[in-house]
Amino acid sequence: MYALLREAFFLVESGYATIEDVDRSLRNDFGYWITFAGPFRYMDLTGIPAYETVMRDLLPDLCRSTEVPRLISDVVKSDAQGVANARGFYKYTRASARRWEKRFLEFTYDIRALALKYPGDSRERVGARLRARKRVGR
């Protein structure tokens, strides 16, 4: 959680994104699935190898480590792809992997509908954007 917050502050303070941009991006990605699954289950559901690939390029910019975490490399080397081949951070049978895929898809549609029911207040969004611009000297 705090690593996420640190990166959010860095993006805003460095002028890469506004507070609204960061909040929207998290809400429209992280916020959709985090109440359904933790990060390891999510990678199982969405395809583990892609995360390793992105980590190779992204981690040097996020922290001092230039290494992909050993855990994900070991999982990828074992040919695990998550629910796609019923092998990932969690153990699956083919049937349980398909059930997880189906549940994830249903949840995704349900949570999107719920999120649309509670849009952010437009005045808050404009205020956040203005405050972020002032902080970065725009």
Regions of interest found by a model, annotated:
Residues M1-E7, G31:
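Structural/interface elements that position substrates and couple domains in central-metabolism enzymes
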